[in-house]
Swiss-Prot record:
Pathway named in the protein's UniProt entry: Alkaloid biosynthesis
Domain of life (superkingdom): Eukaryota
Protein's name in the database: Ipecoside beta-D-glucosidase IpeGLU1
Record organism: Carapichea ipecacuanha (Ipecac)
Family per record: Belongs to the glycosyl hydrolase 1 family.
Main location: cytoplasm
Length: 543
């Protein structure tokens, strides 16, 4: 007779969830990234990134033809944004450091931009002065254009040394105050959509700068597409470039961790992780072993691709079997650097999909075949969506998916400490709405409530999740979607000097998770509440 007692199933509060249901040291916060919010593309000594070049060369490939030159002007309004974080009572704020703002030429040898250093020092100091913990991402997809021109960016092994130097500079300048680092955001997303060039203009060399990620947030435009080999390796196909980029991202991550542990760990005592994108891969037929295996394989290609090397120094077995020599092997020295190069796992979760081993007969037009992984994905079964769509594309709302993803990571990836580094939902930017109407975001409010309830349920089952960061703090420039999609808790008025206003979700989040509400469930809230968000019509900024 076993002496091991089963984990008790504790009740979850559903949409009444609040901070009191979590332990006192659980972290609540929100996130952003540099190119999506900062703007000031030509201010303060910043150099161009691949996104600057891409958006200016091919504005027709951004849904509204916009770019991040101004974004939401957080470079100049960062104190106001930090005030918002404080008013919401968040523990943490996640932001990324713009590589070309620190190193305009990409490398240390090309020169350090002291104005960029000063900006991030001011940002970090302002956060700490307001009792907000910084979570800092080193790479959120903004490769300096100089490095893209020199050697094709992450298609070249040369970038590993340049990224290590950039990371070391950040540790030297900011590590005395920053204790929570994320090396790379969503390496799978960056890798999987790299190497695609569009025939406008029709010369491959003119498109060099646009060979970069095509974000998953927006369907690709119906334009002629020409896929071509890298100039750095003429014999490499675009499909192979995907794995070459991923390989170099992993080596760059390991190099950054090595330099930190060798030079800074003893004095700065920081922690590290990568923010890995996930998706619940639900077997189309859970009674079909082939579909179950296909779903497992799909998760390998989504998450295991970048997590497994940190545990074993090798890619997932399914990837090695299917890709063979197309997937580079790590050297013994590289394996030593990779294994254990994390303190926690950052999990980005938005949505779910059905996975099948064969083409679903009822969804032939919608099902997508993933050639390398040998599986199909579809968002519906027998004509019924896996979850309601948030908008016209890609994000089906499936709260139970985050629970299953967390359980999968616990059971199959050595039970790591986990932070939810991104979780959120978009709404279409409807310019016909009044300001009052635009701030009513019931879909997001319910999305956050339902997903947080599932995160709590996973904790009850022993998953070591220790924090939750909403994506995103504010509406921002959403990559290929431009300004057409809004992910923020805070509404940005793009037509009135980027004025900030709280949406209903921000007011709820503040009332439920303010750091002063570290109380037992069902106890009254403190009476000294400053009331900043008491009314959903209160304006945060006045121009």
């Amino acid at each position: 007779m076993s002496s091991v007692l089963p984990t008790p199933v504790l009740p979850t509060p559903g949409r009444n969830i609040n901070r009191g249901h979590f332990p006192d040291d659980f972290i609540f916060g929100a996130g952003t990234s540099s190119y999506q919010i900062e703007g000031a593309a030509r201010e303060g000594g910043r150099g161009p990134s691949i996104w600057d070049t891409f958006t200016h060369t091919h504005p027709e490939l951004i849904q509204d033809g916009s770019n991040g030159d101004t974004a939401i002007n957080s470079y100049n309004l960062y104190k106001e944004d930090i005030k918002i974080v404080k008013l919401m009572g968040l523990d943490a704020y996640r932001f990324s450091i713009s590589w070309p703002r620190i190193l305009p030429g990409g490398s240390i040898n090309a020169g350090i931009n002291q104005e960029g250093i000063k900006y991030y020092n001011n940002l970090i100091d302002e956060l700490l002065a307001n009792d907000i913990v910084p979570y800092v991402t080193l790479f959120h997809w903004d490769v300096p254009q100089a490095l893209q021109d020199q050697y094709d960016g992450f298609l070249s092994d040369k970038i590993v040394d340049d990224f290590r130097d950039f990371a070391e500079l950040c540790f030297w300048e900011f590590g005395d105050r920053v204790k929570n680092w994320i090396t790379i955001n969503e390496p799978e997303s960056y890798s999987n959509f790299f190497g695609v060039a569009y025939d406008t203009p029709p010369k491959a060399h003119a498109l060099k700068a646009s060979r970069l990620l095509v974000p998953t947030t927006v369907a690709r435009p119906s334009k002629p597409v020409r896929v071509f080999a890298s100039t750095a390796d003429p014999g490499t196909t675009t499909a192979d470039q995907v794995y070459k980029v991923g390989h170099n991202l992993l080596l760059a991550h390991a190099a950054a961790i090595q330099v930190y542990r060798d030079k800074f760990q003893n004095t700065q005592e920081g922690t590290f992780g990568m923010a890995l994108v996930t998706q619940w891969m639900k077997p189309l037929n859970e009674n079909n072993p082939a579909d179950v295996e296909a779903a497992s394989r799909a998760f390998d290609f989504k998450f295991g691709w970048f997590m497994q090397p940190l545990i074993t120094g090798e890619y997932p077995k399914s990837m090695r079997q299917l890709l063979g020599p197309r997937l580079r092997e790590f050297t013994p020295d590289q394996k030593k650097l990779l294994i254990g190069s994390y303190d926690y796992v950052g999990v980005n979760y938005y949505t779910a999909t059905y996975v099948s081993s064969a083409q679903p007969p009822h969804d032939k037009k919608k099902a997508v075949f993933h050639t390398d992984g040998n599986f199909y994905t579809t968002d519906s079964k027998d004509g019924v969506l896996i979850g309601p769509l948030a908008g016209p594309a890609w994000l089906n709302i499936v709260p139970e998916g985050i629970y299953h993803v967390l359980q999968d990571i616990k059971e199959n990836y050595e039970d790591p400490v986990i932070y939810i580094t991104e979780n959120g939902v978009y709404e279409v930017n409807d310019t016909a709405k009044t300001l009052s109407e635009a701030r009513v975001d019931t879909t997001r409010l319910h999305y956050l409530q339902d997903h947080l309830s599932k995160v709590l349920e996973a904790r009850h089952q022993g998953v070591r999740v220790q924090g939750y960061l909403v994506w995103s703090l504010m509406d921002n420039w959403e990559l290929r979607a431009g300004y057409t999609s809004r992910f923020g808790l805070i509404h940005i008025d793009y037509y009135n000097n980027f004025a900030r206003y709280p949406k209903d979700s921000a007011i709820w989040f503040r009332n439920a998770f303010h750091k002063r509400l570290r109380i037992h469930v069902n106890k009254a809230r403190p009476q000294e509440d400053d009331g900043a968000f008491d009314t959903p019509r209160k304006r945060l900024r006045k121009y």
